[in-house]
């Protein structure tokens, strides 16, 4: 099973990278861009057939290592 974890700063937390990317895009005359957020995507294989067990394991990974849950939110997608 393949897991895709997306991690982004929570709404209300200053996204300095997002601001920098937005500024760079507007300086390149891409003026129709707004609300730029920069995050990270972690993709890995998981040796687990049971989807519920896989989701539980990946959630635990996010809570303990992959995301700083004080300032970040995450989403998990499992692909068989």
Stretches with model-predicted labels:
Residues 37-41:
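Short Gly/Ser/Thr- and Asp/Glu-enriched loop/turn motifs at secondary-structure junctions
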Residues 1-11, 42-43:
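Short glycine-/aliphatic-rich beta-strand segments at the starts of folded cytosolic domains
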Residues 5, 11-12, 31, 50:
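Small, basic N-terminal interaction modules of short regulatory proteins
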Residues 52-80:
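C-terminal structural segments of small proteins and small subunits
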Residues 12-28:
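Short amphipathic alpha-helix segments
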Residues 29-34, 73:
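A short linear hydrophobic-aromatic micro-motif
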Residues 14-16, 49-56:
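Short, conserved charged micro-motifs
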Residues 8-10, 47, 79:
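Solvent-exposed residues in well-ordered beta-strands and their adjoining turns
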